[in-house]
Amino acid sequence: MKVTTLTVDCGGTGIKASVLDKGGKVLIDFPYLKTPYPLSPSKLIGIIQDFVKADLRIKRVTVGLPGMIRNGKVVVIPHYININGPRSAVDPNLKKAWYGFDMQSILQKRLKLPTLVLNDAEVHAAAVIEGRGLETVLTFGTGLGSAIFSDGNLAPHLEISHATIRYGKSIDTWIGEQARRRMGNQLWSRRVKSLIQELYPMIIWDKLYI
């Protein structure tokens, strides 16, 4: 039986999905979907169900979510608890719905397919690491994503992006997409370089992927 995987990247501004074969070859890219707000867990599950219904070849599902995801369960999640998305007001009801939500178990039950839910940066990282030494992956988008692997084994997730770096700002705010657009690529790239220099003494990676 062919192993065909639906991969879903759930971001703060957009949701991207692809179907991959066993070797990681892309069989189909679904059209980019702007993240709809407000976004409840049930609404996101409905979106993923629609992807599965659109391609009968899908045999398993991998979902990447922003924030702290532990054993498939949401510990902390940004963006989706906000009424209108990133940096808008927090909706207490959305926060209550998302925090502690067992996305992996519930999604697997709904889809009736093997399902894995991880932090989005960890999913990206799994596609690029070599599995040797201490490897760190940093992703830049709405905010900063990160993943650390030791000899191919995923380390417990750290929300590095929540740390304060300059002027009382979190790394997310200091280095995110909004800052890049405001500053321009050249100045923003200097910030990225500065951030990497500050992170290295804390992690001391053998290889860094950006």
Language-model features, listed with the residues they occupy:
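N-terminal phosphate-binding loop and adjacent alpha-helix
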Residues: 25-57, 86-99, 174-191
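Glycine-rich phosphate-binding loop and adjoining helix at the ATP-binding site
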Residues: 36, 41-49, 60, 69-127
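Phosphate/pyrophosphate-binding loops at sites that engage ATP/ADP/AMP, CoA/4′-phosphopantetheine
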Residues: 46-62, 71, 111-115, 185, ...
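Glycine-rich phosphate-binding loop plus the immediately following alpha-helix
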Residues: 97-121, 154-194
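Active-site glycine-centered loops adjacent to acidic/histidine catalytic or metal-binding residues
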Residues: 120, 141, 210
